[in-house]
Structure formats: structure tokens, C-alpha cells
Amino acid sequence: MSGQDKASQRVLCAMSGGVDSSVTAALLKDAGYQVIGAMMRFWPDDKRVDTFDTCCSPDAAYEARRVAEQVGVPFYLLDYREQFQHHIVGPFLSEYAQGRTPNPCVNCNTKVKFDELVKKAKMLGCRYVATGHYVKRVEREDGSVEFHRGDDPRKDQTYFLWGTPREALPFILFPVGELEKPRVREIAAEKGLLTARKPESQNICFVPGKVQDFVAEHLPQRQGLIREIRTGEVVGEHLGTQFYTLGQKKGLGLYQTHRVRHVVHLDPETNTVWVGDYEDCLWTGLKAEGANYLLDLAELPREVEVQVRYRTKPVRATVLHADEHGFELQFEEPQFAVAPGQSAVLYAGTRLLGGGLIADHARNLPVVPADQAAQPVPVSG
């Protein structure tokens, strides 16, 4: 696209007050686009502002506005408090109450950022939405757009974007997707941006400390039993299944601690935490629901790579079944503690194909109700 063409293209740049979105705005401005900076307000009036992490706080909004002034672009603070509470905070707590382990950042990108922001961009007459995600946008000769892993493998964020509506792909830009993080900071320093040395946010933005503390504040305790998955034996007590996640081995509240046990299964209906050995946490496959695909379903390859948690390497898998609602796949090698509620994200090489929410599994060891667990359960395979 020529400079003259870019000058006629308006871009809504999502700004968080961090270095990545700051450099994104600066690069777009340098490239000749008409840039509008915007930050989404998530913090409610009835909450202390320090309960929000640096990427979503009033201080971050102030810094984003100052960066917009440095870059020379207009800046708007957009009110999305209601949507954030409805689509993100509420479901986050609901998932924990149902024994699942949610990833709110995936939900936020899907239902707030790349849904609401694209709508707002169209209202403002913008051709594109841009963010500071480390994702590569690849445009093919036929005009179709693909999302690929960012060039910095340590910062790649495609895992969080599997839910992006396919029709929105052509309207999203990722200017830092082809850069490594140190270079992004260099650019910020060269331009004198005040966020050049700002540390990265590490927490869930609306959880000020530990997730368990946040969950405890909002969900009531329910005392229950911890049982051994193979025998049904009671080996401890707990204060609620919402305080546990699959694979967990510390802080379980077991009567005896000489043997290492992991959380194998959570059953909120009976208020039971099931524990077992490491091998009991191995999954041979998974079922995912709420699927979204960034290509025609007929083009989804049978052999894929799947990533089941952020910052882990993808593993090879075979797609056994896929439709518009979800998919089922088998791992090439069993995987440890695949957690329902997390995302199963599909790739072909560096290309993001789509994903879904992990709903169920195909472990070697079945979960046995307490009234059927008087005898050890034989392990198949």
C-alpha cells in the first residue's frame, strides 16, 4: 500500500499504556496512516482503582493519553465496563464454580477487543483496528488474511486470538508482530516514548493478587472431601473445588503428605476433589466446544499441532472429528493435566487455524463415582 493510500486509511489503535501498544501507534503514524488512539475502560466506579493491573488502570489510561500526545494522535477513553463485567468477570467466576480453569484473556480478546473494537472502528470511519499483540498478519495474493505466530517466540500471542471472528481478520493490524521485544523497547526509547522502560503486566488485569484470593472473595466456601481416584478412599478435606486446578500437587490439604498426589478431577456437583498419581493426570486426547476456525472447516487438516496452555510448546495431534460446534483430537503422546476451561489452540506450522474450549478428555483412567469405588479401579492400556 502506497503512502498516499495509507494517508486515506484511518486506523483505530488500541492503547493500554504499555510499550507494545505505544510503539504500535508510533509505527502506524510513521507509516502514514490516520491514527486514532483508544483505550477501553474496564474498571468500575465502585472498585478501588488499585485492584486493576497496570494494563487496565486509570494510571495506564493517563499514560496512554500522554503517549498519544507524544505521537501526535487523538485519544479516546471508551467505556466498556458493562461489557467487561458481563463477558469476562462474571464467566470467570462461573467457570471456577463449575470446576473449570478459565482463561479470561482469550474471552476478552474474542468478545470485547475484537468484537466491540471493530464495531467502534466502523462507527468512527476506520478501515483497520490495530493492537500491540505479537502476531503476524499475512495477506495472501487472493486477498485472504491469516494470523501467524509472531517473530519473537517468547512473546507470541496467537494463543489468545483463536476466537477472533474470521470476518474480522482483514481489518486487524499487528505492527509489532514482526519485531522482537528488545527491538520494540529500542524503538520506544529512540522516539522518547515515556513507556519505553515500563515493565510488563503479568497478572490477570482485574485480579490484583492471587487468583485464589479473588475467587475466595466472590465464591462461598463449601467444605467437602478429597478422594483417591483409584480406590475412592477419603484422603483429605477441602473448602471448595473452585480453589483447585488439574495437576495441582501443593496445598491440597491431604491427611498424609508422604506420597505426592495431583488433582485429577473436580466434581462440583458432589463437591469432591479427586487426586491420584502423575500418570492418572495423563490425557490421550480431548474434546473442545465453542470452536472457532480461521479457515473453511473443510480445509482443516487432519494432522495438526495443538497448544493446551500458554507458554508451552504445541504438540502433534490427529483431529478425529470437527464441526462448527467443536472438535475431538488425539495427542501423539499423552499430555499432563489438560484443564477443562482452558483453550485448545490449533496450528499448522506457524499458522493459527482456530481453537476451542477444552470440555472433556480421553484419559486412560476413568473417573469413578464414590459409591462405585470400593475396589481399586483397573487402568486400561
Curated annotation (Swiss-Prot):
It catalyses: S-sulfanyl-L-cysteinyl-[protein] + uridine(34) in tRNA + AH2 + ATP = 2-thiouridine(34) in tRNA + L-cysteinyl-[protein] + A + AMP + diphosphate + H(+). Disulfide bonds join 108-205. The record marks 133, 342 as: Interaction with tRNA. Keywords: ATP-binding, Cytoplasm, Disulfide bond, Nucleotide-binding, RNA-binding, Transferase, tRNA processing, tRNA-binding. Its main location: cytoplasm. Belongs to the MnmA/TRMU family. This is tRNA-specific 2-thiouridylase MnmA. It comes from Deinococcus geothermalis (strain DSM 11300 / CIP 105573 / AG-3a).
